[in-house]
Amino acid sequence: STHCISSAASDVYKRQELVRDMGLKETGILVSCSDYHIFYKMRMTRKEAMEHYLSVVRECLEIGVSPRCHLEDITRADIYGYVIPFCLELMKLSKEYQIPIKVRCCDTMGYGVNYAGAVIPRSVQGIIYGLMVHAGVPSEMIEWHGHNDFYKAVSNSTTAWLYGASGVNCSLFGIGERTGNTPLEAMVFEYAQLRGTLDGMDTTVITE
């Protein structure tokens, strides 16, 4: 089981209580990575934010909980100036504690695109490539979390899959804030087209 918290100090204690009381093995941690979020929401410098996030991650690892770091607003972030260095530190901690750390790429504003020649931070494939090749994040530890503000949640999620992300976050019928998230039913058919099989999934239940 898993749950999700912010990286605020008060939530750290809440997480410890939940882990103790519910026996949770994984927790999601919101780690805003764009300057917009770091400066205006967190009211920190990049250095302060990174040190703060890493301290929360380490606290999770100390009690044997696997962190899932939600890189909020990644399509407006400095990928090679902040995101990659941060993820390198995450991988060092993962190796030190021998506990997997997952990385969730959150296209919070729906700005991501999958066009050939698109540059980071807008390029979905560029983000996934950077995390895998330059930060050393294993494919099985990478997720894509898309928003559909510009109606690219499905194509961006599929692109993330194709370039190495092992997971895609979905919601039934795409229900979510603003214009929604990646629809689960759409990704079922994307999966079937890519793999050539539904692997036992029954698509008719969507009408129930």
Where are these regions (language model features)?
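Catalytic-site beta-strand/loop segments enriched in glycine and acidic/polar residues
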Residues: M132-K152
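Alpha/beta enzyme core
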Residues: K14-I29, C33-R68, E72-V137, Y163
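Single conserved hydrophobic/aromatic residue that forms the stacking wall/gate
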Residues: T2-A9, Y13
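Phosphate/diphosphate-binding loops
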Residues: T197-E208
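Structural motif
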Residues: H70-E72, C106, H145-H147, S171, ...
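Glycine-rich phosphate-binding active-site loops on the catalytic face of alpha/beta enzymes
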Residues: V31, Y163-G180
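C-terminal helical cap(s) of enzyme catalytic domains, especially alpha/beta-barrels
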Residues: G176-T197
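Small-aliphatic-rich amphipathic alpha-helix that forms the alpha element of a beta-alpha
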Residues: H145-S171
